[in-house]
Amino acid sequence: VAVTQQLVRVPDAQLAACRRSVEELDRLCSFELTPRADHLDLDWAPAPLLRACELASGSEYLVALRRSLDGDAEVNPAYRHYAGAIWEHPVSALEGPAVLHVAGTLRGLVPDTVLASLPIDGWEALGQSTGAMADPRGYVARHFAALLDFYEEAARRRLAVVMWWD
């Protein structure tokens, strides 16, 4: 079974409920509490996205991108001991105000600039295996655009973002 990064947009009240209850957090991580449109499956893209940003841009953008993928705080530490949880990757979140800040910062990051920093054999530059694709730029571009759009919508709707590996 593949382990990929998942993000979901939630209202602050839903995040608060998940902080109080591991059962509620499990329902969220089981895709039962929010519409499909509020989910983003980032596949294995976080590491290549971070490395591409590191190669192309300043630390302000790298910090914002890292926060967008890692969150600021674990949602509910008790969830690590819940049946079926992936304890090596705790569920974390960004509160609504942090989402606004991260989305605003990422808005200044130009995807074409990030992609231009990648050589043709970019998988090695990204510290990743080549897998089935020789050129990683399309993969990075798709996931980068999806992440930026996801955060723009979360900021517009004043939602928090919860992230985990599943």
Model-derived regions, located:
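Short, well-ordered loop/turn elements at secondary-structure boundaries
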Residues: A155-L159
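A structural signal for short, well-ordered beta-strand segments and their strand-loop junctions
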Residues: A160-W165
